[in-house]
């Protein structure tokens, strides 16, 4: 399963309550149970926002796949969010975000990609099995 994780998911994953949905999703990506994709522009945003967690940025660089978008999009009012849509070239199935307010990822689908909040993503068929596998270690 290919996903693009909005920066807010990674920021939420750093919160002390490490069993939150965002932390589980990051662990699924970090361990390769789901395939997370980023572009160089997204990596730059991750590094800016997660600057106080350099170890997390290093794990992302090591475990996420990089796509190189061929086109620049401008379909979302909040311009930086367009970088995440540009990763559609990686054939991602989901963009996981908490930013579903107007001007951000306010539609449920962009082309063939579904937009899901963390709790919704964990309820996608097959993801629960991956979480159980992760927790069994």
Model-derived features: positions:
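PIN/NYN-family metal-dependent endoribonuclease catalytic core
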Residues: 4-5, 15-17, 21-50
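Short secondary-structure boundary segments
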Residues: 7, 40, 98-100
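Conserved N-terminal substructure of TIR/SEFIR domains
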Residues: 11-12
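Residues at the C-termini of beta-strands that transition into short coil/loop
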Residues: 40, 70, 117-119
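Extended, non-globular alpha-helical segments
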Residues: 43-58, 126-136
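Active-site neighborhoods of divalent-metal-dependent phosphate/nucleic-acid chemistry enzymes
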Residues: 65-108
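Acidic, PIN/NYN-like endoribonuclease modules and their adjacent C-terminal/linker elements
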Residues: 78, 82, 101-137
């Amino acid at each position: 399963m290919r996903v693009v994780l909005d920066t807010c998911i990674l920021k939420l994953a750093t919160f002390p309550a490490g069993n939150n949905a965002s932390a589980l999703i990051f662990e699924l990506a970090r361990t390769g149970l789901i395939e997370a994709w980023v572009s160089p522009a997204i990596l730059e945003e991750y590094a800016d926002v997660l600057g106080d967690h350099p170890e997390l940025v290093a794990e992302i660089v090591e475990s996420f796949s990089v796509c190189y978008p061929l086109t620049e999009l401008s379909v979302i009012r909040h311009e930086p969010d367009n970088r995440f849509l540009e990763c559609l070239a990686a054939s991602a199935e989901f963009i996981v975000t908490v930013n579903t307010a107007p001007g951000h990822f306010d539609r449920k689908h962009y082309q063939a990609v579904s937009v899901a909040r963390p709790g919704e993503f964990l309820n996608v068929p097959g993801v629960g099995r991956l979480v159980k596998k992760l927790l069994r270690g």
